[in-house]
Amino acid sequence: AAAARIIEETFPELLEENGGMREDGKAEESEGKQGNGEMPESEGKQGNREKPEILPVVNESGEVIGRAERKEVHQKGLWHPVVHCWMYAKQDDQIWFYFQKRSEIKDDFPGYYDIGSTGHVADQETAQEAVMREAEEEMGIRVEKDRLHYLGTVKEEMDINGCNDREIAQVYLYHLDIPFFAPGEEVSEVIAVSKEELEKKELENAPYIQGHSLCGEPVFLRAKEWCCHEGEYQKLVMPFFAERGIG
């Protein structure tokens, strides 16, 4: 049923092992709001770090050619590495993807829905290390390496109000055994979307799709409420499932 309590009914063992779910299925939201959908001018994720955040700078082939402060990287449009981690769980014949709703404290795209976890690769950090760190910071998941699949790379470019964001994303897919989340302060909510509904958005350009909160309530997700990762699902995620005959 559309309003089924996905976590409670589909994964009852989750509640048994973790003592139940919060009624609202959310992490507590931090007070105050920052940002308006513009690229961040802050040095770190929340703009309050004592030291500037240093990022590796790469060429268009992804080779590291230097390092620079995050602010400089965005202002000058320097290519830099990031990670995207799609998350899914499988129950019977149904595949569910899990997406985050970005907190209102985020400098860029607050309140938008996005891939399970995303983030910059830090200086002297590998992409796999970055994926594992971001998944734990944002979604409260300790990644098991044997469930983490590397899919490939995509390039993304955005020019917003004078800031140029040029990223080379290392894309991963993580198979959740039991979809239990403990979102950090940068994530206000986790949403479950069936593969069927997701493909209405990705393949048919549907104006909205239906997802569910973690306590099973239906949520209608408009296309304009999503961060844009155009073609990533079709290019990298779909082939993974097709090659393995999943879903």
Task: Annotate each language-model stretch with its function.
Residues 53, 81-83, 117, 150, ...:
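Residues that flank catalytic or metal-binding motifs in active/ligand-binding sites
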Residues 142-152:
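A short coil-to-beta-strand element that immediately follows conserved catalytic motifs
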Residues 30-48:
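Long, intrinsically disordered low-complexity tandem-repeat segments
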Residues 49-92:
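Acidic, metal-coordinating catalytic segment for phosphate/diphosphate chemistry
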Residues 136-140, 157:
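Internal, conserved structured core segments that host functional sites
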